[in-house]
């Protein structure tokens, strides 16, 4: 991120120039301080204790069978979010840390910022010999893609997470054939 901060800021400037709703500008802005914040957030996530394989609960059945509830990855998590570019990096890092793949669809207002952040994240995965395809970014403003994602991808996506306002959450809950968190 730090090596590519000028590239990130350049892409972010495109989003800021195209911003239709001026009240979104503060949430869209990526400057050196916010890029450092994204880097810090990713580092914190990397330092989290590995959540996979944790014994969450144990009990013994009357027939003396020992049962363990163990944390496992969910699988493929689709995340639909609004105009905060930092969410791209946070969600990709959280999904990776928890052993999950992610499909990211950010708000149209931040498409250039989200695209560069997703690209850099995938590039970092590849450099670290991790399959970059465990993070996918939907590089389109077309809302029909979201409709198709919610209604036709239930064989491929295990859970959908809407991150945004009431309107987004309501739409996802109404139209999704995939479990929604």
Per-region residue spans from a language model:
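Catalytic cores of large soluble enzymes that bind and process phosphate-bearing ligands
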Residues: 4, 27-34, 109, 113, ...
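Short alpha-helical
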Residues: 7, 86, 112, 144, ...
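N-terminal Rossmann-like NAD(P)+-binding subdomain of aldehyde/semialdehyde dehydrogenases
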Residues: 1-67, 94
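Conserved small-residue-rich beta-alpha loop and adjacent elements
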Residues: 40, 47, 51-124, 128, ...
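Conserved NAD(P)+-binding/catalytic subdomain of aldehyde/semialdehyde dehydrogenases
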Residues: 76, 137-181
């Amino acid at each position: 991120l730090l090596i590519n901060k000028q590239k990130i800021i350049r892409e972010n400037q495109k989003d800021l120039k195209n911003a239709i709703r001026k009240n979104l500008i503060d949430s869209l802005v990526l400057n050196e301080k916010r890029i450092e914040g994204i880097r810090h957030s990713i580092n914190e996530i990397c330092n989290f204790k590995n959540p996979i394989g944790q014994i969450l609960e144990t009990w013994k059945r009357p027939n003396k069978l020992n049962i363990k509830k163990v944390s496992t990855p969910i699988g493929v998590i689709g995340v639909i979010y609004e105009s905060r570019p930092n969410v791209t990096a946070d969600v990709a890092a959280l999904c990776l840390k928890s052993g999950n793949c992610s499909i990211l669809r950010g708000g149209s207002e931040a498409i250039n910022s989200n695209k560069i952040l997703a690209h850099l994240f995938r590039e970092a995965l590849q450099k670290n010999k991790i399959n970059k395809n465990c993070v996918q970014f939907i590089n389109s403003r077309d809302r029909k893609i979201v409709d198709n994602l919610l209604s036709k991808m239930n064989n491929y996506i295990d859970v959908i997470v809407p991150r945004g306002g009431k309107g987004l959450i309501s739409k996802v809950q109404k139209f999704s054939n995939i479990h929604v968190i």
